[in-house]
């Protein structure tokens, strides 16, 4: 008899078929308490869980006594109670490598669109404001040869550094938990403390996961240390930034502009002051949102669940010691 798994995110037909070759698949719309209650028998028997954008906490796990592995279609897993999963010896799988290049593209797009004011001036053209040769009030700022500061030199940070160094001749500063020899050798990147990075960078790109240590890592103190001409980019996790402090820094002119793919609360409220600022490019968490990459992430998540329930956790496992 095939193991039972619960799928709470739609999959392309071919990936669903692959999942069904290995498991009895039960599809649900979400992991809300109502859904769990209505499908209590299915949740009680499930050995696997696959999906994204839903919280998996101790309350849910109490309803799933046979759960052995959960696979998320994402690299981030701050919506999972890792301690609760680990305590119950449940494997947590994620997709850390598939989206690297695409998210780096998004970061570079935010750098370019904020510096050159692409969104703002495009809207002015649509509004009929382009009636003569443009003047300085339409101008942006250069990207090439400007200093890029990267906070978090992981896979995505490396991919961004590659684009910035080779494509735009940008000097690279970085701050991370440890020195990154490859970044220093390939891109001539310079390791520095966070204060130095903030003071010297023309662009500050934040690429950090959300943890207890990184929550509100960026606040009023950090923005005050940046150049008034600096542009802030966040494509990591929204709560790493104190959003009210960011808004204040933009309003006071402490920083020049911001390109944001993530926010403290998502979706972003239509009443957010960020949406009324011409110098803010706000996009709806599109970091990995291409057809090709989202398919690749889903395929990876399917393979991860198959591997996990077969006892193979050599890669893409957040808590591999559970399998020991």
Curated annotation (Swiss-Prot):
It holds the Pfam family 2-Hacid_dh_C. Its main location: cytoplasm. InterPro entries: D-isomer_2-hydroxyacid_DH (IPR050223), D-isomer_2_OHA_DH_cat_dom (IPR006139), D-isomer_DH_CS (IPR029753), D-isomer_DH_NAD-bd (IPR006140), Glyo/OHPyrv_Rdtase_B (IPR023756), NAD(P)-bd_dom_sf (IPR036291). Keywords: Cytoplasm, NAD, NADP, Oxidoreductase. PROSITE patterns: D_2_HYDROXYACID_DH_2 (PS00670), D_2_HYDROXYACID_DH_3 (PS00671). It is found in: Cytoplasm. Signal peptide: none annotated. Homodimer. This is Glyoxylate/hydroxypyruvate reductase B.
């Amino acid at each position: 008899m095939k193991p039972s798994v619960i799928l709470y995110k739609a999959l392309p037909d071919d990936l669903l078929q692959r999942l069904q070759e290995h498991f009895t698949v039960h599809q649900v719309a979400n992991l809300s308490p109502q859904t769990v209650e209505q499908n209590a028998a299915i949740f009680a028997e499930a050995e696997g869980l696959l999906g994204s954008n839903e919280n998996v906490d101790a309350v849910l796990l109490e309803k799933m006594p046979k759960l052995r592995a959960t696979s998320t279609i994402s690299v981030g897993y701050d919506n999972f109670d890792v301690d609760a999963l680990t305590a119950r010896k449940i494997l947590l799988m994620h997709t850390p490598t598939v989206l690297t290049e695409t998210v780096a593209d998004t970061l570079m797009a935010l750098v370019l669109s904020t510096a050159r004011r692409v969104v703002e001036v495009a809207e002015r053209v649509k509004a009929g404001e382009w009636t003569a040769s443009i003047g300085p009030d339409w101008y942006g700022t250069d990207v090439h040869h400007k200093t890029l500061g990267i906070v978090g030199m992981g896979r995505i940070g490396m991919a961004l550094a590659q684009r910035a160094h080779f494509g735009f001749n940008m000097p690279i500063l970085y701050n991370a938990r440890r020195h990154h020899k490859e970044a220093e050798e390939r891109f001539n990147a310079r390791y520095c403390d966070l204060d130095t990075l903030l003071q010297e960078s023309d662009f500050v790109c934040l690429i950090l996961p959300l943890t207890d240590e990184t929550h509100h890592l960026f606040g009023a103190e950090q923005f005050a240390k940046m150049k008034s001409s600096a542009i802030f980019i966040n494509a990591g996790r929204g709560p790493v930034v104190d959003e009210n402090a960011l808004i204040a820094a933009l309003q006071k002119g402490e920083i020049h502009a911001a390109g944001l793919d993530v926010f403290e609360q998502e979706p972003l409220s239509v009443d957010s002051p960020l949406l009324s600022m011409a110098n803010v490019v706000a996009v709806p968490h599109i970091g990995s949102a291409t057809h090709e990459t989202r398919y690749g992430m889903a395929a990876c998540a399917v393979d991860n669940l198959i591997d996990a329930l077969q006892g193979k956790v050599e890669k893409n496992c957040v808590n591999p010691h559970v399998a020991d």
